[in-house]
Amino acid sequence: VSSDYAKIKSVTLRPVVKTRLPSSLIHVGPENGDSLATPVMPLIGENKGLMMDFDILEDEIRPLQWRIIHCDRNWRKSNLVESEYMTVVDCDFLIDGDFADFSYNTTVPYVHYDFYFPFHGGSSTPEIRFLMSGNYVVQVYEQVYEGEDEYAYESDIVLIQKRFVVTEQLVEIQAEIKRPNLVQYMDDSQQISMKIVPHGFDLSTFDKDLYVVYRQNGRWDNTICGIQPNHVSGDGSLVFNDNRNALFKGGNEFRNFHFKSLRIATTPVDYIEKNDGKYFVYLHPDRDWHAAYTSTTDLNGNFLTSEDTHNNADYCADYADVKFTLPYHRNYYDTLDLYVFGGFNDWKLNDENKMTYNSRLQQIGNIF
């Protein structure tokens, strides 16, 4: 992360941090507990805020802190000062032992942290509210001292940063997903058509002031941005229709598995073993899905933390190594790379989730 937070992404920046729930195993969502909801909150009205929770794989509590950063439409740190978008400025929001729980009866020790924002405050904690809508990032960091003796200086080490959005209902948005009109995209893509009804809101300079962002199932990695309307209707509404740039590939259904219990192997888990005090979950060899499409219910690439034995998965669920296998014949000229990816790693294709080829004509993947 550069000094000006250029193009702030949702990431886990330190390898010691392992987080859970949607997006990079970090959960930022409504405080009502809907773990699959998109982290969006209204500026006005019943503002119940958001919750962030994560795990750090160690057996002691760190004195962490968090802060809010306002971003422009391109997710770069804006030029606004804190007092322009928040009611509280220059305040260190601590994540101490009151916001942390040690894991219970797990093979992998971890500390589970969670906190809510904004909050109403208390006798010693000021209230925090947002003053404007827009793009925001919540950062979790720790302060460390570098150097020695009188030459020591304080430095912020950012562990996690996640995006969220504060909204205002200034216009009416009418949108639908339909089959593309263009023949070459009919069988593999989905088209978004949209109409923005101003209801008195000034959209006369939409070419400069309006910036449209389409997201597929809450993802940030494949957003479609900057789409312009096809025409303006008589009532001033902006119509976005039949635009080949507003297409998402339909893809296929996501593969599903769960190991809520590490004692019983459930479909599609082949078997579970425990070696050196650690669990290993082996999935049945998968198959290529180049076949007739069948609809299945899934989480659109996201995941939930759950555990059958105890009442609270936040600190009772265990970690395991999961082994993925895809039978695949690789030719000498084949340069295809295969990955296991989804919400658990923020939809990133990297070396950690890249599958490797072995002599048994299989692609092998391992995710912890």
Q: What is each model feature region?
A:
Residues 89-119, 220-233, 323-368:
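Aromatic-rich carbohydrate-binding modules that target alpha-glucans
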Residues 203-294:
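Long, internal scaffold/assembly segments composed of regular secondary structure
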Residues 58-92, 202-229, 336-345:
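Extended low-complexity, serine/threonine- and proline-enriched intrinsically disordered segments
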Residues 109-143:
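Ligand-binding face of N-terminal immunoglobulin V-set domains in extracellular IgSF glycoproteins
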Residues 147-172, 297-305, 325-330:
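Extended, polar beta-sheet/loop recognition surfaces of beta-rich domains
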Residues 282-336:
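Basic K/R-rich, polyanion-interacting modules in nucleoproteins and related proteins
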Residues 14-72, 184-198, 311-324:
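Contiguous beta-strand segments within globular domains
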Residues 2-12, 157-187:
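Low-complexity, Pro/Ser/Thr- and charge-rich linker/hinge segments at domain boundaries
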